[in-house]
Amino acid sequence: SDMRGQFGVRPKETIDRANELLENFAALLKKRGIRVDRPTALNFNQPIATPDWKTKSMFGTMPARDIILTVGKEMLEATMSYRCRWFEYLNYRPLLKQYYNEDPGMRHESAPKPRLTDKSFHMDYLSDKIGVQKRLEWTAKKFFVTTEEEPLFDAADVLRFGKDLMVQHGFTTNLKGIDWLKRHFPNHRVHALNFPGDPYPIHIDATFNALKPGLIINNPNRRLPAEQRKIFEKNDWKIVDAAQPAHNKPPPLCFSSVWLSMN
């Protein structure tokens, strides 16, 4: 996406259009008898800081699935690996409090908040001087922008298959984060996946997605390695290539690749 590294307030007309689409989608769900809850937004266009770092603005509150991992009755706040998303969990705290009060079986958990010091990143990794071919070599070797300084994971790197949790190892989730998930969910089997064809492996939904029991679509440019396919093949899951996106490039102001069409 051309938006990599960009931040700040979006044009009002794009905000109004997005809100219109969101309201229409919420209304459609309500007509079908689905309960729709909305997060409480913060002022994202403000500087934030911890004792270790500061950044000029926050990200937003569009994708709840990035922040909250729901497994059974538990809703787990992910660590997050972007400094600009460090406080994003606050948007969902009112809802989590509400669910906790409504359901005596609900568990609200939070993973250890990372410090995200410079030790957590290879600081020159995203330099514009580094070409795509070099990035593909790095991701094939599982060398990513995040280090193993502390556990890091985004909820959007996790796919749930009953008692199996498939977790993408990439930019936003490291091996310590995957190990933390294994310890936190002892009654689940946690598997690490990686996709060497992706130079910017962030979140699994535009790469690998289950459509129904027994059928998975995989981004044809980011195929799951043969060794990691075995668990699916042994359990009679079919992995097929996803259809090509309708567009060649993302729309203006979009942070995602065209392969978001898979979600």
Language-model features and meaning:
Residues 1-263:
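The feature marks the mature, well-folded catalytic cores of soluble enzymes
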